[in-house]
């Protein structure tokens, strides 16, 4: 028996990296994290959307803030996005003087937590600095399907982990309005 999941509730995680956020039917995912074309293709229709989150060089092996095996999801994304009419990408896009970087917080080490005006903030190694190789999408990712790219984290005083709002949970990125 196939169980449909609310579009808003399905997040498919891979190796600790929340990539991609799939707004569709879970029934098309096999148990091995591979798309199974023999199953119900209940996704990719009408207003379903695929949101590809931060598949950038700095988050892949060899980058400044790598996720182990983060690049392994790229073939899955490339296959999935062909089935959606609406594909959106998010892209971490920081200035070099971003407030979350360890280099801009004397006495703080990467992965420490500090208090910011909007709440707790993890201190990160510099990553995804705009117009650098690290901020670019991974070369294996076929970005031709992206209808829109939402850049986030470009305000130096606030970080952004969400494709929808900055970390203050008030400042929108624009994605909600597009959807």
Model-derived segments and spans:
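N-terminal export signals
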Residues: 2-4, 9-30
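Short N-terminal micro-motifs specific to bacterial/archaeal maturation
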Residues: 1-2, 64
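Secondary-structure junction/capping motif
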Residues: 6, 138, 174-177
């Amino acid at each position: 028996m196939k169980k449909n999941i609310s579009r808003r509730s399905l997040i498919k995680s891979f190796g600790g990296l929340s990539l991609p956020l799939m707004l569709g039917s879970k029934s098309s995912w096999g148990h091995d994290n591979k798309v199974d074309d023999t199953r119900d293709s209940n996704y990719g229709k009408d207003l379903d959307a695929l949101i590809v989150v931060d598949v950038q060089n700095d988050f892949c092996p060899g980058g400044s803030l790598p996720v182990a095996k983060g690049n392994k999801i790229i073939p899955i994304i490339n296959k999935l996005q062909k089935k959606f009419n609406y594909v959106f990408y998010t892209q971490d896009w920081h200035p070099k003087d971003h407030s979350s970087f360890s280099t801009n917080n004397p006495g703080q080490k990467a992965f420490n937590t500090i208090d910011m005006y909007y709440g707790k903030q993890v201190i990160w190694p510099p990553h995804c600095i705009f117009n650098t190789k690290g901020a670019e999408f991974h070369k294996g990712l076929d970005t031709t399907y992206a209808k829109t790219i939402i850049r986030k984290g470009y305000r130096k005083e606030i970080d952004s982990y969400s494709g929808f709002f900055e970390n203050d949970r008030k400042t929108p990125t624009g994605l909600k309005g597009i959807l």
